[in-house]
Amino acid sequence: MNIFDFFRDRKKESTASVAKERLQIIVAHERGQRSTPDYLPALQKELVEVIRKYVNIESDQVQVALESQGSCSILELNITLPDR
């Protein structure tokens, strides 16, 4: 066994572990997006329409997020209101 083979084999292992880690991150990200309900964009649009009846806002001033913690789901609504 030559000294260069030692470094070459070690590099292959580290490359494989880096690839595995990246794949795990991608899979976790995809799973997180899949758990988001399909109705959230429609809900956000309807909320903007209702809020516009009372306050002049743009659609990007309303953010809707759904978080799950165990068996409990939390709907978070953030509205940036204009100054008077």
Swiss-Prot record:
Keywords on record: Cell cycle, Cell division
Keyword Cell cycle attached: yes
Keyword Cell division applies: yes
Gene Ontology biological-process entries: cell division; regulation of division septum assembly
Pfam families: MinE (PF03776)
Gene3D superfamilies assigned to the protein according to its UniProt record, in alphabetical order: Cell division topological specificity factor MinE
Signal peptide: none
Source species, domain of life: Bacteria
Similarity comment: Belongs to the MinE family.
NCBIfam families referenced in this protein's UniProt entry, alphabetically: minE, PRK00296.1, PRK13989.1
Biological role: Prevents the cell division inhibition by proteins MinC and MinD at internal division sites while permitting inhibition at polar sites. This ensures cell division at the proper site by restricting the formation of a division septum at the midpoint of the long axis of the cell.
Name of the protein in question: Cell division topological specificity factor
